[in-house]
Regions:
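A short, basic N-terminal segment
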Residues: 1-35, 40, 57-60, 132, ...
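Amphipathic alpha-helical "lid/sensor" segments that cap RecA-like P-loop NTPase cores
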Residues: 291-293, 297-382
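A short acidic (Asp/Glu
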Residues: 48-49, 75-78, 223-229, 256-262, ...
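P-loop NTPase nucleotide-binding core
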Residues: 40-212, 254, 264-290
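Long, acidic, intrinsically disordered low-complexity segments
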Residues: 23-56, 290-303
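The catalytic "switch" region of P-loop NTPases
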Residues: 184-215, 219-330
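C-terminal leucine-rich, beta-strand-based interaction scaffolds used for sensing/assembly
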Residues: 328-329, 340-343, 357, 364-462
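Short, hydrophobic/amphipathic alpha-helical patches that form generic packing surfaces
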Residues: 90-102, 300-304, 425-432
Length: 462
């Protein structure tokens, strides 16, 4: 039996029936507020957005799910450093608008809407507006001033031959002058999205009572320097339109939604103002102080993925999540799996799969979990951190100091400390460090606030 590791490889029915929401996350996700959905790799951002798409479609609203990794026709264009940000940014905006246009055109053809003719008419306007988008960035101007003056004078005197007189004089003057003026400076990025916004407003009106949901996944696949430009498109042309809800899936440390400029204005989206909220899946999946809740979450996760298939494979399948855990794991093995996963569903699935291979036809025991966690760390995480020398040294220091000397797996880091903060963030992105609690206040120094981290289980398990 094989459990899909990535949500996009599963069909819609599987996505709908296997989704498990942590705490109040589902209620927050279903709200019509604009939201940014943060989460590290493997926390279930794509699964959550695809699950939301299924729910929205069942309510007769219109939903567009766009994987930003797939937009555009020229591979590598956005990351091509030989092109200016102006060119790359303009291509990104046009490609995004064209993708939205194509998805809406599919809706107009395949679904019944309140005003079909109006929808098609405004789609034409959106198509026209998408080609007029322009981003202005760093510029270099060259001005040429030149001119040529030419004059000629001729004097001739002639008489008939036999006898004769012939005299001639010619004078020619040519003057050419050219000057060049080159100016180089940085102009504030700006976009002209008025026609886009008007077209989208007309599209929403044509949909009638149905709401338009725009789900943008894999935001962090866009180069960092271009992300504020796309965010600005959303802020100026999409977010102000009543009847549209935008949800964005992103990796927090690899995202840049906001770029201030010296004039006091900004490019992009201001989280908390333009977008109502940013929701972190990592925070919802922190179970350090609720072990029972963590075990219930992962038990339901495994049962939702495996239960339906087991009914087709064996005569007496487990009837609920608790029975599945009891029959598949020995007494202490499942709590150890939950601890090893550190709140990351994809890690839990991969560790369980490796442990099942080690156990063969027997229930998975504690030794299987520990060996599988170590193998998964070496296969998936160790290779990535080895390519980053500062991160590798930092991880080795933390394991030696925290695990080796202090006999712990957790430590505190001052939120205001810049020392080694970037390296710690890289380890966090790689799922080698995990946040257990944010905003821990020191009672003796109330002005100092800490984040509590845990070192990944695979780094130290023997």
């Amino acid at each position: 039996m094989r459990i899909p590791r990535r949500a996009e490889s599963a069909d819609r029915y599987t996505l709908a029936t296997t989704y498990v929401a942590a705490g109040s996350f589902a209620a927050m996700l279903n709200s019509t507020d604009h939201q940014i959905l943060y989460g590290r790799r493997g926390t279930g951002k794509t699964h959550a957005l695809l699950y939301l798409r299924n729910l929205v479609e069942n309510t007769r609203d219109v939903v567009l799910y766009i994987d930003l990794r797939t937009i555009g026709s020229a591979g590598g264009l956005y990351s091509d450093s030989s092109l200016s940000p102006t060119v790359r940014g303009t291509h990104l905006l046009v490609d995004t608008l064209e993708t939205i246009h194509e998805e809406l055109l599919t809706v107009a053809i395949e679904q019944e809407t309140a005003d079909q003719d109006g929808l098609l008419r405004h789609l034409d306007l959106l198509g026209q507006a998408s080609t007029s988008v322009e981003v202005v960035g760093e510029v270099e101007r060259e001005t040429k001033v030149g001119g040529t003056v030419e004059s000629a004078r001729s004097l001739g005197l002639a008489a008939s031959a036999h006898p004769g007189l012939n005299a001639s004089a010619t004078r020619r003057r040519s003057v050419t002058r050219e000057s060049r003026l080159r100016r180089t400076g940085v102009e504030r990025h700006h976009v002209m999205f008025g026609p886009v916004s008007r077209a989208l407003r007309g599209i929403v009106e044509s949909l009638g009572p149905a709401r338009l949901w725009l789900l943008l996944d894999e935001w962090s696949s866009i180069p960092l320097d271009l992300q504020p430009m796309l965010a600005d498109l959303l802020r100026r042309s999409v977010l102000p339109v009543a009847g549209i809800t935008v949800k964005i899936g992103a990796i927090e440390r690899r995202s840049r939604f906001y770029l201030p400029n010296p004039s006091g204005d900004y490019l992009g989206i201001e989280v908390g103002s333009d977008a109502a909220s940013a929701v972190s899946l990592d925070d919802f999946l922190i179970f350090d102080h609720a072990r029972t809740r963590a075990q219930e979450f992962f038990a339901e996760l495994f049962y939702n993925h495996a239960g339906g298939r087991l009914k087709l494979m064996i005569h007496s399948p487990p009837q609920d999540a608790a029975t599945l855990v009891e029959e598949t794991f020995t007494h202490n093995a499942f709590p150890e799996l939950v601890r090893a996963a550190e709140g990351v569903p994809r890690d839990a699935i991969n560790i369980a799969a490796l442990a099942a291979q080690l156990a063969h036809d027997e229930p998975i025991d504690l030794a299987d979990i520990r060996r599988a966690a170590r193998d998964w760390y070496l296969r998936d995480k160790h290779t990535a951190v080895n390519a980053n020398e500062p991160a590798r040294r930092m991880l080795a220091f933390l394991v030696d100091e925290v695990v080796g000397r202090r006999r712990s797996r957790t430590f505190l880091l001052d939120q205001l400390s810049d020392a080694r903060r970037e390296t710690v963030n890289q380890l966090y992105d790689a799922r080698l460090l995990h946040v257990l609690r944010r905003g821990i206040v020191d009672r003796h120094n109330p002005g100092r606030v800490y984040d509590g981290f845990a070192i990944d289980y695979g780094c130290y398990v023997a």
